[in-house]
Amino acid sequence: MNLRSKVDSQPAYVLHSYPFRETSLIVEVFSRDFGRMALLARGARRPRSAIRGLLMAFQPLEIAWAGKGEVLTLMKAEWQGGLPLLAGEALFCGYYLNELLMHLLPREDAHEQLFASYAKMLALLAADPSGKVREADLRCFEKALLQELGYGLTLNHDSDANLIEPDTFYTYRIEQGPVRIDHGEGATQVVRGKTLLDLDAEDFSDPRTRHEAKALMRMLMAYYLAGKELETRKIFKELQEL
């Protein structure tokens, strides 16, 4: 339970919002110093509400709240400007990031470094007018997210404490990290040592590294999401089938 009666001038981003009663919203925000918070925006759905147009995803805000309990009351929201609206692939990617944070971040658990990584990622997504997304940027954010949650990847040594060898094949096991295998041994998820080292160095110049790193991250996210299917991924699949 949140015991802080009032917080002012807190940098934050909207992750998700949904209607509450006739004229209000429950807004899930990611704040710099308090982590994920649930706030009641009273009257935000009224046509003349001063904050109705401000509570948008992917835009930097400065907010204030007051109250006690799990859902606090939003007192103020000011747009900090500077980011174009996301479009195309970047918009889907932004919603993907928000879903990850909604599902994986516990409430009221501060992650200042992750907040900075999220803000940087949004700036990168907004920087390309075509809405294209660099896979390298997405992999770096996913890696930072897991690190912040205490699920940091082991990428430079294997389960036997041996240094990762670029030309050796491994399978990645959640509780053990990279486990050396003979290529073709039948593991469901196989990754080159070079890919692990590239991911550690955040070097995605090799196309095969990008492909294998994507598969590895997808497996890890599925595990930590504990079976929850992300809406963004489902919608993207449906669009590809049209």
Swiss-Prot record:
Pfam families: RecO_C, RecO_N. Keywords: DNA damage, DNA recombination, DNA repair. It comes from the Bacteria. One of its GO terms (biological process) is DNA recombination. GO terms for cellular component: bacterial nucleoid. SUPFAM superfamilies: ArfGap/RecO-like zinc finger, Nucleic acid-binding proteins. InterPro entries: ARFGAP/RecO, DNA_rep/recomb_RecO_N, NA-bd_OB-fold, RecO, RecO_C. Belongs to the RecO family. Involved in DNA repair and RecF pathway recombination. This is DNA repair protein RecO.
